[in-house]
Curated annotation (Swiss-Prot):
Keyword annotations of the record: Methyltransferase, S-adenosyl-L-methionine, Transferase, tRNA processing
Organismal lineage: Bacteria, Pseudomonadati, Pseudomonadota, Gammaproteobacteria, Enterobacterales
Top-level taxon in the UniProt lineage: Bacteria
Protein's UniProt keywords contain Transferase: yes
Stored InterPro entries: SAM-dependent_MTases_sf, tRNA_(Gua-N-7)_MeTrfase_Trmb, tRNA_methyltr_TrmB_bact
Subunit structure: Monomer.
Protein name per Swiss-Prot or TrEMBL: tRNA (guanine-N(7)-)-methyltransferase
Pfam families, A to Z: Methyltransf_4
């Protein structure tokens, strides 16, 4: 498994170009079992980042719909969802190695064969590895809201990002975002309103308080215990 989660870029003078990213590069804690899972299962479940598009039919050995999840954390929800929907393929992207190790371990012991994961920056993966009109759904559950105003530029959900996702969805494709931040919820809704090709499936309610087909994540359980309201934002690609 390659350890670089971003592709270094330099200007003509050789100076490293720093970009605003939605995550902080840090080593963090990783357990022995997570490291062992990476060593044992990465070759069968993981996909190394490459500057070339994926052929999903070749990757999954079938032509079933592909669902992309960005930032899957420990992978518990992603693995359970993949197990519950064996007729769909799942691709997960995560930038923290501990989450990669945890997800690999869970996926192996679940015995599923419809899940692949990538350890890299999601925007680079979307730009370089995902062909247009190949995803049936993109789900982003509890992205970092970067609550301080001066940090809003770090938020993953920006207008340019939503347009990137739009191009990757196939006809009737779905974008599903979940947040426990009321301010981030309205921030996203305001962005979506200025992009013509998204239909808000929640219609007059503007957002779902809960989406019955989504599994509850550990993060969501903690958010509810803290008294936070959960917002499910679901948008469909306009034909």
């Amino acid at each position: 498994m390659k350890n670089n989660i971003i592709t270094p870029q330099y200007n003509c003078n050789g100076t490293f170009l720093r970009k605003n990213r939605s995550f902080v590069c840090r080593k963090g804690r990783i357990t022995k079992s997570q490291l062992q899972a990476i060593e044992k299962y990465w070759l069968s479940i993981g996909i190394d980042f490459k500057l070339e598009p994926l052929d999903f039919t070749s990757v999954f050995k079938n032509s079933a719909p592909v669902i992309l999840e960005i930032g899957f954390g420990s992978g518990e929800s992603l693995v359970k969802t993949a197990a519950n929907f064996p007729n769909k393929n799942f691709l997960g992207i995560e930038v923290y190695k501990s989450g990669i190790g945890s997800c690999l371990r869970l996926a192996h012991y679940s015995g599923i064969n419809n899940l692949k994961i990538i350890y890299h920056d999601a925007i680079e993966v979307i730009d370089q590895m995902i062909l247009d009109h190949t995803l049936s759904k993109v789900q982003i559950f509890f992205p970092d809201p970067w609550n301080k105003k001066r940090h809003h530029k770090r938020r993953m959900i920006q207008d340019f990002f939503l347009i990137k996702i739009l191009k990757k969805l196939n006809n009737d494709g779905i974008l599903h975002i979940v947040t426990d931040s009321k301010e981030y919820n309205f921030f996203i809704l305001n962005l979506i309103q200025n992009i013509d090709n998204y239909i808000n499936l929640s219609k007059k309610r503007m957002c779902f308080e809960h989406f019955k087909y989504r599994l509850v994540t550990n993060f969501e359980k903690k958010a509810k215990l803290s008294g936070n309201k959960i917002f499910d934002l679901i948008f469909k690609l306009k034909k």
